[in-house]
Amino acid sequence: MLILETVPLLRREVRRWRQEGKRIALVPTMGNLHDGHMALVNEAHARADVVIVSVFVNPMQFDRPDDLARYPRTLQEDCEQLNRHGVDLVFAPAAEEIYPQGVSQQTYVDVPALSSILEGASRPGHFRGVATIVSKLFNLVQPDLACFGEKDYQQLQLIRKLVADMGYGTEIVGVPIVRGEDGLALSSRNGYLDSDERRLAPRLYNIMMQLASQLENGERDLEALLEQTASRLRQAGFCPDELFIRDADTLGDVNVDTRTAIVLMAAWLGQARLIDNVRIAFNADA
C-alpha cells in the first residue's frame, strides 16, 4: 500500500493506473477510521480495480476552531487498518499541500441550493468546505466512482448535486449506515463519549425510530411530532440540535408528491454531537 503526501506523487500513480486501464474508486475521509469507513472501502473494492482513500482533516469545513483542534488524528492506526483491507493508496496531505495560500485565499465551490439549509443553516461555511475539498480531490484523482456514507445524508445529496451540476464523470455511491449492535450509528465523534454517555447514546436511535413509526402509521401533524421527539430527547439526557422531516430526494418540505421521507436528527450528548437519519415510505397510498 502506498502512502503519499503530495499532489505530484498522487497524480503520478493515478496516471499509471489509468494507462493500465484500471477502474479507480475514491473514498474521501477525515481519518480516525472505524468499521463504517471500512464498509465504504469494501464497497469500493466491489466496484473498482484500485481503491484510493484520502485522509485529510479539512480545515475549511470546520466552523469552530476548537472542534478542528480536537478532531482525532490517528494516521498510523488508520493506515494499518486500510492496509489490512487491501487499499492501494492512501493520500494524506498536509493542509499546506491542499491550500498552499491558506484557506482564506482558496478558491471555493458552493452548492447554494443545499449548503444553507438544514445543517448548513447552523454551520455556515461547512458545506462550502465539503464541496471544495471534494471538488479538489475529484480533479486530482478523476475517480470512476466515489463512496460516501449515508449517515451524512445532506452531504451525500450535496455531492450528488455537485457532480451533476459540474459535469464530473464520477459515479457517487451511497453506502448504508453501519451501526453497533445497540443501534448507535458508528462515528469518529463517538470517541468523545465517556462510558456513561456511551451507554445512553443508543437512545438517539430508539427515539428516531419511534418518530419513524409514528410517520409510517400515518401521523401527519409534523410540528407536534417534532416537538414530542425533542421532548423525548431532552428527557433521555440529550440536548436536541436539529430535527427535520424532509423529502428524501430533494431535502425540501414533504408534500403530496413525496414518496420517501427522511428523518434527520442531530443532538448533543456531553461533548459529542451525534447525527442519524432514517428513510421511510410517505404517501405510499397516494
Curated annotation (Swiss-Prot):
Pathway: Cofactor biosynthesis; (R)-pantothenate biosynthesis; (R)-pantothenate from (R)-pantoate and beta-alanine: step 1/1. Gene3D superfamilies: HUPs, Pantoate-beta-alanine ligase, C-terminal domain. Pfam families: Pantoate_ligase (PF02569). The active site is at 37 (proton donor). Beta-alanine binds at residue 61. Its main location: cytoplasm. Keywords: ATP-binding, Cytoplasm, Ligase, Nucleotide-binding, Pantothenate biosynthesis. Its EC number is 6.3.2.1. It comes from the Bacteria. It is found in: Cytoplasm. GO terms for biological process: pantothenate biosynthetic process. ATP binds at residues 30-37, 149-152, 178, 186-189. The reaction proceeds by a bi uni uni bi ping pong mechanism. Homodimer. This is Pantothenate synthetase. It comes from Edwardsiella ictaluri (strain 93-146). The gene is panC.
